Amino acid sequence: MHAEEIIRSIEAEHFKETLPTIYVGDTVRVGVQIREGNKERTQPYEGTVIAKRHGGINETITVRRIFQGVGVERVFLIHSPRITNIKVVRRGKVRRAKLYYLRDRVGKATRVKQRFDREL
């Protein structure tokens, strides 16, 4: 067995099969497993997907939201065991693969139009 085949077989064990189709511009709610002391809980993080990076097991999404007037971005490894669930709240209609321009916008200018032709 070659090294590439070994890596692919290990990655296949950790792949999550039941993920929704996520597009840039979508508003998603990501459930993140958090440890506080000796307790574990799921913390929801809701925001707009501004970037998506493909790469098999290393696939990531960058989610941006405004919290107390400050823009907060988090990068999530989609296949990470810390991600308990991902739910698409609404579909967004955009013409770009990366929405980094939203970082410079304030208030209502950061809104993304809703798209109705794709299923949630």
UniProtKB/Swiss-Prot annotation:
Disulfide-bond pairs as recorded: none
Record-level GO BP terms: translation
MF GO annotations: structural constituent of ribosome
Pfam families in UniProt: Ribosomal_L19 (PF01245)
Key word Ribonucleoprotein present: yes
The UniProt record lists the keyword Membrane: no
Keyword annotations from UniProtKB, A to Z: Ribonucleoprotein, Ribosomal protein
Entries under Gene3D superfamilies matching the protein: 2.30.30.790
Domain of life, source organism: Bacteria
GO cellular component terms given for this protein: cytosolic large ribosomal subunit
Function as written in the Swiss-Prot or TrEMBL entry: This protein is located at the 30S-50S ribosomal subunit interface and may play a role in the structure and function of the aminoacyl-tRNA binding site.
Family in the record: Belongs to the bacterial ribosomal protein bL19 family.
Name assigned to this protein: Large ribosomal subunit protein bL19
Gene: rplS
